Amino acid sequence: MLIDEIKKANVEAMKARDNTAKGIYSIIMNKYMLLSIEKKQKGEEATDVDLITIISKTLKELTEEKESYLKVNNLEKANAITHQEELISKYLN
């Protein structure tokens, strides 16, 4: 499953001490786990399609956040968000 790939990428980010990558992977995993719990209560199971939806929404949130940082000329934060976008967008292909 796709979540397993993200978990593996999170472990690699931890080993590399890449806090930016670790942060975004953790966010994705937490959102997926919350959705998984909700679905289990309904007798359903979370799928890769659900995870792709989560990633898409997170990318949109990151884009909006990056635009805010660019408006106030905080390039360091904007660049970190660009890195996060690159990391998770590859899971949409």
Outline where the language-model segments fall.
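N-terminal cationic and glycine-rich segments that engage phosphates or anionic surfaces
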Residues: 1-93
